[in-house]
From Swiss-Prot:
The protein, known as: Ribosome maturation factor RimP
Pfam families: DUF150_C, RimP_N
SUPFAM superfamilies: YhbC-like, C-terminal domain, YhbC-like, N-terminal domain
Source organism of this protein record: Mycolicibacterium smegmatis (strain ATCC 700084 / mc(2)155)
Predominant cellular place of this UniProt entry's protein: cytoplasm
InterPro entries: Ribosome_maturation_RimP (IPR003728), RimP_C (IPR028998), RimP_C_sf (IPR036847), RimP_N (IPR028989), RimP_N_sf (IPR035956)
Localization (cell): Cytoplasm
Similarity comment: family membership: Belongs to the RimP family.
GO biological process: ribosomal small subunit assembly; translation
HAMAP family to which the protein is assigned, alphabetical: RimP
Amino acid sequence: MAPDPKLPSADLPSQKQVIELLDGEFARAGYEIDDVVVNAATRPARITIVADGDKGLDLDAVAMLSRLASGLLDTVDTGDTPYVLEVTSPGVDRPLTTEKHFRRARGRKAELSLADGSSLTARLGGTDGDQVNVVVAQGKDFAVRQIPLREITKAVVQVEFSPPNRRELELAEQTGKGARA
């Protein structure tokens, strides 16, 4: 019986092994590993590391983390199994599910679904323990609302194509270049 190509190759490290190998070094660099996918079904096999940090993940950070991961993974015996290493950010479509996700998305606009069945679009402000401050439109102005994280059933960052309103950013405890007055 042929091996299942969806399962990691015996020569590739497991998800757990990759996390154990890289977690400490990523943390020292100021980043966390959100997920690792080891996929032997692709040709060549692929190891994808999803990382994030409080300052986000720009191209320089991705390059640095890729070099770091590559160097550490080179110490693992993968036999003759070639693989592609990919280091990436979680992406804008990742649901916000933890306090740190909300903290890292501060200043971004998000679509929120609440436990009472209502939904709203708001700019995310700071977190305070078990709640998040959000900025919502109120007529021609903006208001700050505090929402307990347990009341948020779904939250997804929205892509914006124009600069945010300066007042809205100020209320979200943000300053931003290019914000319109």
